[in-house]
């Protein structure tokens, strides 16, 4: 069994490498963000020498949000990239309501311009209030959760993509698709 603390630390490093800085570790992602699993393991071993392929596969399998994907001998982050990637995710045509957690100080800008991806390619949305709340907590203590009308997004021509088990992504959330602010 993989220890939770070790798994958490390695998963954070994997997210950093795969989402933001593969080149810093000598990796060259393809257009979809995939790198060779063996190369990722070598990169991670420079920080955590005890890491094995089984350990990485266990992280991928047990990740509750489905952050990572292994396809053949390659691995990628499924969402959250700060560099351009082509994500060929399935469209979510069924969700009616989605959630976005943020800190209160961001509300003024959001209510003026909608939710923008900022330094990422997509806005991250959650299937549950709880997930959105905890995502918002990473940015501060005064969290608000925005209720997003998924049908409104679709009517406006936005595609909602299934990026992970409980995560959806969209290019932008216009103000008029924010249906409620939950404290």
Curated annotation (Swiss-Prot):
| E.C. designation(s) | 2.7.1.-
Protein name per the record = Probable RNA 2'-phosphotransferase
Q: Which keywords appear in this protein's UniProt record, sorted alphabetically?
A: NAD, Transferase
Its job: Removes the 2'-phosphate from RNA via an intermediate in which the phosphate is ADP-ribosylated by NAD followed by a presumed transesterification to release the RNA and generate ADP-ribose 1''-2''-cyclic phosphate (APPR>P). May function as an ADP-ribosylase.
Q: Which organism is it from?
A: Pyrococcus furiosus (strain ATCC 43587 / DSM 3638 / JCM 8422 / Vc1)
State the encoding gene. Answer: kptA
Fetch the PANTHER family from UniProt.
Answer: PUTATIVE PHOSPHOTRANSFERASE, TRNA 2'-PHOSPHOTRANSFERASE 1
- Pfam families assigned: PTS_2-RNA (PF01885)
What molecular function terms (GO) are annotated for this protein?
NAD+ poly-ADP-ribosyltransferase activity; tRNA 2'-phosphotransferase activity
């Amino acid at each position: 069994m993989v220890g939770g603390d070790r798994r958490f630390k390695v998963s954070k490093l994997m997210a950093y490498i795969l989402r933001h800085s593969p080149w810093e570790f000598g990796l060259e992602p393809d257009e979809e963000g995939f790198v060779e699993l063996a190369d990722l393991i070598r990169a991670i071993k420079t920080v955590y020498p005890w890491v094995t392929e089984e350990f990485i596969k266990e992280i991928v399998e047990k990740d509750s949000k489905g952050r990572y994907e292994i396809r053949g001998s390659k691995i990628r982050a499924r969402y959250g990239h700060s560099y351009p990637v082509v994500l060929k995710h399935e469209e979510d045509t069924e969700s009616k309501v989605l959630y976005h957690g943020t800190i209160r100080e961001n509300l003024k800008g959001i209510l003026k311009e909608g939710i923008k991806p900022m330094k990422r390619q997509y806005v991250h949305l959650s299937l549950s209030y709880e997930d959105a709340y905890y995502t918002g907590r990473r940015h501060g203590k005064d969290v608000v959760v925005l209720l997003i009308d998924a049908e409104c997004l679709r009517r406006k021509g936005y595609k909602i993509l299934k990026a992970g088990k409980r995560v959806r992504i969209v290019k932008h959330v216009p103000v008029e698709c924010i249906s409620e602010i939950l404290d």
